[in-house]
Design a protein with these regions (language model features):
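Mobile active-site "lid"/loop adjacent to the S-adenosyl-L-methionine
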Residues: 7-9, 13-37, 42, 51-53, ...
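Phosphate/oxyanion-binding active-site loops and adjacent basic polyanion-contact surfaces
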Residues: 31-39, 265-270, 324-326
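Short coil/turn segments at secondary-structure junctions
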Residues: 26, 30, 94, 257-261
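Conserved proline-anchored active-site loop of SAM-dependent methyltransferases
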Residues: 4-21, 72, 288-303
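Conserved beta-strand signature within the Rossmann-like core of class I S-adenosyl-L-methionine
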Residues: 54-58
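Glycine-rich adenosyl-nucleotide cofactor-binding module
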Residues: 250-285, 304
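Accessory, often C-terminal, charged low-complexity segments
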Residues: 2-3, 7, 20, 42-47, ...
């Protein structure tokens, strides 16, 4: 039903650290090959859920980063890898670290098809947003010099002649034109140091945005052409997210405790890490999927963003661990209540997929039949994460020595 309809998949899978960050009953100490199989099966299916312009964002730490990149390049295509984001989620670092004190984890972002992928024009950095200190009837903006100062020598007059032309300003600074007029000031893109550079746009393009240009006279008498940079243009999103809102202690652990009183959930993501990902990659009517729902941060983020921008995004969260399900459901119900949201939250339990195998095991009369059922289960059943298939197969002779009743157990 949802194949090809999901705009964003956000997942925070078990990191396979082998350390103290064990996530409840997840087997967080897989060997690399088992962990990769665990991930590959899910990611291969996940790709089919994405729309052609869809994205997947995967949180991971350094331990499996290299392995995961190789796997996701294979599934989604290296050409669709849009970025590896470093999220500073623990700015104080890990005091017990033997070598480097880790302050970040990572987020891999892939598109399903980069020909259709498009980021939203958003500003994720609060400090940058505060620089938009002007406002008119069209909204917030800030003034930027219209001279192209970046790009080194490439944007010098001698190397880009078509971007060197005069802009004319009326004596009262009220009118700006590209047509030469009597008594108008003639302004060229020359810096305060006398360097001849270029304007940001060609003459034809500048003609179309003259209404967004302002002339200012400095204390030194120099006239500058300034551009209204609109907040709607957003910003190029950097690959390092270091804003304090991404702190997983303040906006993950403590936030969850504040909402539902839970102090025992290990390392929930900062709400704003997920919220900003959803803000960047989805529209107001899109579907977001998270099949490692954990504490329900993704659902919470979607609800908060809908409240912020009036969107009608929907989320689907999938979780199989009882500890997580209880936390997740309670959190979403609380958020809906606290925000007086009219959104509905529907909770389903999947039909016991393995029930047919249980019935086959109970009805079998021969040990050989049990072994045949086991081979089918390895391919078709949903086995618990703690089941090590390889180890089970290594002890097959010991299994054969058991009585039929013991084998069924």
């Amino acid at each position: 039903e949802f194949a090809g309809k999901v705009k964003l998949i956000y997942i925070d899978p078990p990191y396979n650290t082998g350390g103290d960050a064990n996530i409840f009953t997840y087997n967080n100490t897989f060997n690399h090959s088992t962990w990769l199989t665990f991930m590959k099966n899910r990611l291969t299916i996940a790709r089919d859920f994405l729309s052609n312009d869809g994205f997947i964002a995967i949180a991971i730490d350094h331990y499996e980063l290299g392995y995961l990149i190789t796997l996701t390049d294979e599934i989604f295509g290296q050409e669709n890898r849009l970025g590896i984001i470093s999220v500073v989620n623990n700015p104080m670092g890990r005091n017990q670290a033997k070598y480097f004190s880790t302050v970040n984890d990572f987020m891999l972002v892939y598109s399903k098809n980069n020909e259709f992928a498009q980021f939203n024009n958003v500003i994720l950095n609060g400090d940058f947003l505060n620089t938009f200190d002007c406002e008119d009837e069209q909204g917030k903006y800030k003034l930027q010099n219209f001279i192209r100062v970046g790009g080194g020598d490439a944007n010098l007059k001698v190397n880009k002649q078509t971007f060197w032309y005069p802009i004319y300003v009326s004596p009262d600074f009220d009118k700006i034109t590209l047509d030469k007029k009597e008594n108008f000031f003639e302004i060229y893109p020359i810096t305060s140091t006398g360097q001849e550079r270029t304007w940001k746009l060609s003459k034809n393009s500048t003609e179309k945005i003259l209404h967004e240009l302002i002339a200012e006279k400095g204390s030194n008498g120099v006239i500058s052409i300034m551009e209204k940079y609109r907040v709607e243009k957003g910003q190029k999103v950097p690959t390092i997210w270091s804003d304090k809102k991404y702190n997983a202690n303040h906006n993950g652990i403590r936030l969850l405790e504040k909402i539902i009183g839970n102090k025992n959930f290990s390392f929930p993501k900062s709400l704003y890490t997920v919220l900003d990902t959803v803000k960047l990659l989805t529209g107001p009517n899109d579907i977001v999927l998270d099949f490692h729902a954990g504490s329900g941060t993704t659902g919470h983020a979607v609800l908060e963003l809908n409240k912020e921008d009036g969107g009608k995004r929907q989320f689907i969260m999938v979780e199989q661990l009882t500890e997580h399900i209880n936390v997740c459901n309670k959190r979403i119900e609380k958020v809906l209540g606290l925000n007086n949201l009219k959104s509905s939250f529907i909770y389903f339990e999947l039909k016991k997929y393995n029930q047919s195998f249980i019935e086959q095991i109970e009805n079998t009369k021969e040990a050989i039949e049990l072994l045949q059922i086991w081979e089918q289960m390895k391919v078709k059943s949903f086995l618990n994460y703690n089941v090590d298939i390889k180890k089970q197969d290594e002890h097959i002779e010991e299994f054969k020595a058991l009585t039929l009743a013991e084998q069924k157990q």
